[in-house]
Each structure stands twice: as structure tokens, then as C-alpha cells.
Amino acid sequence: MNIHRLLQNVKYTGNPGDFDTDFVTDDSRKVRAGCVFVRSKGGSFDGHTFAEKAVEIGAKLIVAERDTGVENQILVENSRQAYALMCGNLFDNPAKKLKMIGITGTNGKTTSAFLIKDLLQQMGKQVGLMGTVQNMIGSQIIPAKFTTPQPYELNALLSQMYKSGCEYAVMETSSQALAQNRLYGIKFDVGVFTNLTQDHLDYHKTMENYFDAKCLLFQNSEKIVVNYDDPYGKKVAERFKDKEVITFSDRDNTADYTARNIEYSSKNVKFLMVAKGSINRVDFPMPGEYSVHNAMGAALALIALGFDETDVCTALNHVHGVKGRCEILVKEPFTVICDYAHTDDGLKNVLSSIRPFVKGRFIVLFGCAGERDSAKRILMAHAVADYADYVFLTSDNPRGENPQSIIDSVSGYFDEKKVPYTAEVDRRKAINSALNMLQYNDTLILCGKGHEDYQVLNGITVYLDEHDIVKKFMDNYNKEN
């Protein structure tokens, strides 16, 4: 691609020259002969220190925010924004050829993304997906390294989707990705807001910064679907009142769509989705109060795209579950559930939904992530103590922190509340201990890992798949019983 085409819509000063290139990167480890290297700032490494080395390797052009001292450079105001635009140009801006749906929020992004993909496929559409669990092009599964990929990988994936015949792309958009301008230049047909609770404050520092990062999605969305029951959802609706905002609620009749006559069970939730001039019955095959919000948000994303309301609500009755999201691994003689809940709000949502249907003891296994927002740990303990009969305190991803210290930071709360617990640093051992404790009609929920099949311990990623652990236990259990 000619450099001037690569730089289309990028505002810069300097002379880029006139040459062709097939690669642009902001990763110093990927610099190669003939490429364009974008020097970005972030984290512990400043790409601005690497310019001379990149030219020695063979980079044709350096894109930077300040003078690097090398001859072949251009200067931009924001290198991350420039990089995102260049990556889009390199792949011929595939986002412009697709109907783009973005989902953001603390909880519910993954479930919402899979629901929207499922609903679109029921409408006969070819759909691509990017998210925490996996990326997908139709039925093809591509492993996901990030909730939202870096600009080069993101545009490469969107290009693959388009070339494979996809008409729609459904994306989870993380707050970090939005703040880092990974999605800069991409316009969304619909943006969906699920909720906002304390998370990622190690990165954003304040809830206001966290909220502002989420709102970057809606600045670039033509239509916005908002959970009006969330306080921050009301702020989204107010901030973007000049756009087409569609609100939903299970309690506020001022919302555009409300859920009424809600009936909960251990297997599903039934409700009427009511709007001005329409009533549609929904029999949604996933349990829990939060499932009402997930179902309505997904349905309204399609309705915002112009699909028939009745057709969409009918399709909601036939959607499939998502791996690691309130996923039932064992149904009898006891119940074992796997869920990704890793925030206090996520834990409260899933535990409060399951608790009413537990016939025996409710046993909760969870841990708190290391090197992440430590203030939320005690809030997670509060949520668990409110619902559990017995708790297994274990490790999540300790990373470089001492896992025992993480456990010790919350164990005192269970002592104070007189909630019995076992503390076990080794998550595999903790899971097996919890499984061996189960009696008839008990329910065990494994919280925090969900779809993940690994742990990060001291900077090393080790294999740990809770699905496999439970399967091996049940294979032995069934042989002996």
C-alpha cells in the first residue's frame, strides 16, 4: 500500500516520502524491513526511545508525537489514534463494510455479545464476534488474547469477517481498549451499555475516568441501547440525549421498554417486554434477574438495527448459553455451576439468582485477582458472605502477589460474619475439596474463571480448566456410586 493511502485521514507534519509498505506496527518487537513504526507511549515502555533502532532494522518511516532525531519521520498529535487509523486503512477499513455492534459495561458484555450473535444468526445473517471467550467468524473459532484486540489484529479480523461473507460484527469493547484508542476511527451502528460497577480502578484510578472511557463507544455510535436500571445508564442516556437512545428496565416505567410480569425459575426467566404500542412474551432459557437485562439489551440491539420486534422476541426463546456464564456442569445428585463472576456486583448478581433455588447447602468457591484493584476484594467478600452457607477461599490469578496474602486480606470478614470457610491457595486442590464435600441437593458454584483454562502465578501461565477438573471428579464419582 502506498504510504499516502496508509496515512489517509491522519493529520501529521513532515514529509513521509513516497513508498509502498505492507506492514505497520507500534510493537518494537515486530519491527521489520520496509514497515512503518508508530512510536506510542504507554505502560512501562515508551516507543519514543526506539526510533533509531527501528530505522537500523529497516523501518521506512517513524510516526511519533515528538522529534526522534531520525530523518524519515512524521509527527502526529496522538500516535495511538494515528496507529488505529493507519491499521484501518491498511485493511481497507473493513468496519465501514460491516454493520458494527459494540457492547460495553462491567458485567454482561460476553453474554450480551453471544446473544446478539445468536439472534442475528436466527435471522439468517452471517456474523463475526470479538470478545473475552473467543473470536468467531461464523462458526470458526479463533482464540482471543484480549477482550478487544489491538488495532492491527482488530482490523485484520474484521477484514477476515468481511471476506468470509459476514454482514455483522459484534464486539465486546473494554474500557482499556477504548481509553487506548484501539477503536479510534470505527463507527458503530449500535452501542450497548450493560452496567457499571467498581472494576479496573487499578488502571482508570476513578469511577469517573472509568465511566468516561466507556462513553467513548457511544460518541461513535449511531444508536445507543441503555440499561436504565443502572445509575450510570441514566448518565449515558442524559449525556447522549441528542442521539437516538433506547432505554430498557425491569422496574422503571419511564424507560422505552420495560419487563413486566417477571417469573424466575432455576432454568429460565419469563416476562413480557412492553413498549408503547407493543407487548411481546419472552421465555428466556437462562436463569437470573440479570438475564432479563441481558435478554432485553440484546433484543433491542437488533430492534435498533431494524429487525422486527416480534421476530426478535421469539428468537430469544431459542438462544444458547455461554461457556462459563452460569454454566451448569453437573445437574444431579448435586449441582455444580461455573461462572466468570469476578467483581462484587457480578458475584451478587449470580449468587442472588441461584440462592432461591438451592435445596441443600450453597457452597461458593472464589478468589481475588492479584495486582488488580485491591479495594474491591472486601466488597467481593461481602457479596459472597451474604449468600453462601460455606465458602472456599482460593486463588484467582495471583500474578506477582503472594496468594496467601490475598486470601488473608478477606478471610477475616468471614470470621466476623461467622460464615464457615476453608482457605486453600491451590485452586485445583480447593475445587477437589469442594467437590468431595458435596452431598445430595447441594449446589457448588466456582466463581472467577468461567471460560478461562489457565492461572497466572508469579508471571507464569499454567493450565487449569475447571471443566476438566469437574469432569474427572464426576467420572470417578459415577464409577464408585
Please place each PLM-identified region on the residue numbering.
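A short acidic, helix-capping loop that chelates divalent metal ions and anchors anionic groups
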Residues: V70-E71, M136-I141, Q198-Y203, R372, ...
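Acidic, Mg2+-coordinating active-site environments of NTP-dependent enzymes
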Residues: H4-R5, A64-V70, F188-V336, S411-P420
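A structural motif
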Residues: A59, C166, S221-E222, F307, ...
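Short loop/edge segments at beta-strand edges and connector loops
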Residues: G14, A64, E77, G131, ...
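Short, well-ordered alpha-helix to beta-strand connector turns
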Residues: T21, A33-G34, A59, V70-E71, ...
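ATP-dependent carboxylate-amine ligase
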Residues: M1-Y12, A33-V36, G42, E244, ...
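N-terminal leader/targeting and accessory segments in enzymes
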Residues: M1-L85, N89, T258-E263, R281, ...
